[in-house]
Amino acid sequence: MSDAQDKLLQGEMNMTLNMTFMTSARDAVGKCLAELGDKHDDMLVLTADVDTSSRIQAFKEKYPDRCYNVGIAEQNLMSVSAGLAHEGFRPLAFAFAPFASMRCYEQVRTDICYSKLPVVIIGNGAGYSNGASGCTHCGLEDSALMVACDNMTVLEPGDPFQIAKLLEAAMDLNAPVYIRLGREAASSLYPEDAKYEIGKAMIPREGDDGAFICSGIMVHFAMEAAKRIHDELGKEIRVVDM
């Protein structure tokens, strides 16, 4: 594997939110947080000691009194977020994906979802994308756990522009939302002005000989696989981005 590929998988390349460059999901979130804060006076950002990893610096500099680091205590993160939501705030809770789901599952299920509170949970480093930190930081079960919670909507965007639009949609949903993000860098699949609807699939590639149904970073792998199948076998595979 080349150095560039290795950096790509680790999400460590320096990128900007641009159609011709690549960006990681967390960089895309960080870029739009401050703008969301301008629109939502009641928006708060909370982290489990992952400020740098979550790319919240721009928001923190602009709104220092609306950022809270509760420490490496994900159960506390979710309960505090629930309490703030009860008081009329709109919390965004950031943690690594396995800890945002498994370590604090009771608090997510009972404190947030049971009361259908508008808390947006952002799980970073999903899948194997945080593998450099060891198996403890690999989030493979988070989607299944979150989907099982009543009133919870799970989103796994894989396009930088899609991330920004879906984060804004999550803020308007007025219900619990889990956004699953990897560390990998990805290019844009859709134009900046593309329309997204929660629960509706996008079709970045058409085809009648088969289909790949996927989400998140896997959409990019599916697009590459579909291209290779076309080039080597002459078959047209549709890619469905859920």
Predicted stretch roles:
Residues 2-180, 185:
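Thiamine diphosphate
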Residues 71-72, 240-242:
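Short beta->alpha junction loops
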Residues 81, 146, 212, 229, ...:
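Hydrophobic, well-ordered secondary-structure elements that form the walls
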Residues 24-38, 59-60, 165-176, 186-232, ...:
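Glycine-/acidic-rich phosphate or pyrophosphate-binding loops and their flanking alpha/beta elements
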Residues 181, 214-216, 241-242:
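Active-site proximal loops enriched in glycine and acidic residues that flank catalytic Cys/His/Asp
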